[in-house]
């Protein structure tokens, strides 16, 4: 276990995980409360579609044009999801529509990459990321970007929380749901585009949903729920990275499994605490 702490790339990967967890746990609160759990996977897949297009167009994989293509596709997804809220009134669940977008984007990625030599490797990297090989400069850049997104959310927290907790009430008070949703999903897409390149689709989804679910399971107080989510993300990231080095396993799936184990343990503890209360 201790040998992991002596490896420079361990600390870079850990810091990257914590940077991701910081903003994802907060965004996850909104996503879980809005009931659009799989929007992260769908937007991440839209970003992957943009990268796949860049690969076919022979654009430099780590260059700015690849990033812009990926970001452009996530903005398309953001606009689609903002529009789709209105379709819920036609008795079509939002999650079903999100699932269609996700499946179509993923199928398109497979079709595009089927004829490329690096297709299989690219798909794998999209899923599991590259935490142990991430450039520290990229981590700093992403941290600054997330700080800007966090600042924007702090300034706009009132309308965002109103729409998250009571969208129909917010609309009745004059909030334009489409435009506020567009702003939310655009910032969300900007976050996902950057994080998928580091951690992959699977871990990004895990860091978004699992800490938020853990916090909301434990308490209804937003601040406390966020704190619980951040602690779980920290412990789960350390457990996953140490296990990854110890057993020579991919980093992102190891962290995701660790987060799930912690969530299950928390659920057991909360259940056991509720039983004595039920008897009294």
Which residues are covered by each model-predicted region?
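Membrane-interface helix termini and inter-helical loops of multi-pass transporters
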Residues: 1-6, 59-62, 118-134, 242-245
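Membrane-interfacial amphipathic/re-entrant helices at transmembrane-helix boundaries
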Residues: 1-22, 64
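Hydrophobic alpha-helical transmembrane segments
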Residues: 10-15, 67-72, 96-100, 139-144, ...
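Short loop segments and helix-boundary regions at transmembrane helix junctions
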Residues: 29-42, 52-119, 215-227, 244-247, ...
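Cytosolic-side transmembrane-helix boundaries in multi-pass membrane proteins
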Residues: 57, 249-280
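Transmembrane helix-bundle core of multi-pass membrane transporters
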Residues: 94-159, 183
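Membrane-helix/interface signature in polytopic inner-membrane proteins
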Residues: 151-184
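Transmembrane alpha-helical segments in multi-pass inner-membrane proteins
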Residues: 202-253
């Amino acid at each position: 276990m201790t040998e992991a702490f002596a490896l420079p790339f361990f600390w870079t990967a850990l810091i990257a995980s914590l940077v991701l967890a910081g903003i994802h746990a907060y965004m996850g609160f909104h996503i879980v409360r809005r009931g659009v759990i799989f929007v992260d996977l769908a937007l991440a897949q839209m970003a992957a579609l943009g990268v796949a297009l860049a690969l076919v167009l022979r654009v430099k994989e780590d260059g700015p044009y690849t990033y812009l293509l990926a970001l452009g596709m996530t903005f398309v997804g953001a606009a689609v999801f903002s529009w789709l809220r209105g379709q819920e009134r036609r008795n079509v669940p939002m999650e079903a529509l999100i699932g269609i977008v996700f499946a179509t984007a993923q199928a398109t990625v497979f079709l595009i990459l089927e004829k490329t030599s690096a297709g299989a490797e690219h798909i794998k990297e999209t899923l599991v990321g590259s935490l142990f090989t991430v450039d520290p400069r990229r981590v700093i850049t992403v941290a600054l970007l997330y700080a800007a997104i966090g600042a924007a959310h702090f300034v706009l927290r009132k309308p965002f929380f109103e729409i998250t907790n009571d969208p129909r009430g917010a609309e009745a008070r004059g909030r334009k749901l489409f435009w506020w949703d567009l702003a939310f999903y655009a910032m969300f897409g900007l976050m996902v585009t950057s994080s998928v390149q580091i951690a992959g689709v699977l871990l990004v989804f895990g860091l978004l949903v699992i800490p938020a679910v853990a916090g909301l399971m434990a308490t209804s107080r937003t601040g406390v729920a966020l704190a619980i989510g951040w602690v779980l993300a920290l412990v789960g990231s350390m457990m996953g990275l140490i296990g990854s080095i110890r057993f020579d396993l991919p980093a992102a799936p190891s962290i995701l499994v660790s987060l799930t184990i912690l969530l299950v343990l928390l659920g057991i503890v909360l259940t056991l605490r509720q039983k004595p209360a039920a008897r009294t």
